[in-house]
C-alpha cells in the first residue's frame, strides 16, 4: 500500500469535494492513484454527496419500523431536497434501513456527535479522569488516554457513527452519503425516537406461589 501524503489527500478533496477521511481511504484503497481514487469515491457515491451536503434539505418523510414481536418501535425523520426524491425507492429504502438501525441500537441517543450536550461530555470526562488505572500517570498522558476513551464512549451514543447492520464495513453516515450520491440530493437524518414496550413502567414482582396463597385467603 502506497504512503498517502497530506498534499495528495488535499488535492483529491479539492477535486472531488469529498471529506478528508474519505479521500484518505480512497487513496489507500487505490495505492495513491488519483484517478482510481476519484473513481472509488464516485462508485461509493461519496464525491457528489459531499458537494451537495450544504444544500437545504427540507422535504423528506417520517418512517416507522416495528420489530418482530412488536416490542420495539421507531419513528425517524429523514430529509431530502425534493418531494419527488422522498417518494422514490432509494430514499424509502434508506429510511427503512436507518429506522431498523435505530431499533437494533438501544444505546443510541443522538443523530451526530455535534448533538451531544456539553454536560454529557463533561460527565464522561469526569468519570474517566477518576479511573484507578490512571492514577500516577503524567497529566499529558492521562489527558490523551481520557480523550480516546471518551471518543469511543460517545461514538456508542451516536447513530451516524454505528456500523451499518446490513454491512458492517461502512457506518450509517457512509451509507447516507452513498445513497445521497446515487440520488443526487442532500440527505439528512433529522431526528428519531425509539420505543420499547413497557419501558419506564414499574411492575410489582409477585411470585406465583404467593399470588395463589393470597387468592385462597381472600
Swiss-Prot record:
Q: Molecular function terms in GO for this entry?
A: translation elongation factor activity
**What Pfam families does this protein's entry cite?**
EF-Ts_N, EF_TS
What UniProt keywords are attached to this protein's entry?
Cytoplasm, Elongation factor, Protein biosynthesis
Gene3D superfamilies the UniProt entry points to: 1.10.286.20, DNA helicase RuvA subunit, C-terminal domain, Elongation factor Ts, dimerisation domain
GO (cellular component) term, any one: cytoplasm
Q: What is its main location?
A: cytoplasm
Annotated spans, Involved in Mg(2+) ion dislocation from EF-Tu: 82-85
Its subcellular locations are: Cytoplasm
Spell out the InterPro entries in the cross-references.
EF-Ts_dimer_sf, Transl_elong_EFTs/EF1B, Transl_elong_EFTs/EF1B_dimer, Transl_elong_Ts_CS, UBA-like_sf
Quote the function comment for this protein: Associates with the EF-Tu.GDP complex and induces the exchange of GDP to GTP. It remains bound to the aminoacyl-tRNA.EF-Tu.GTP complex up to the GTP hydrolysis stage on the ribosome.
Describe the family membership recorded for this protein in Swiss-Prot or TrEMBL. Answer: Belongs to the EF-Ts family.
Alphabetized HAMAP family for the sequence: EF_Ts
Q: What is this protein called?
A: Elongation factor Ts
Organism name = Prochlorococcus marinus (strain MIT 9313)
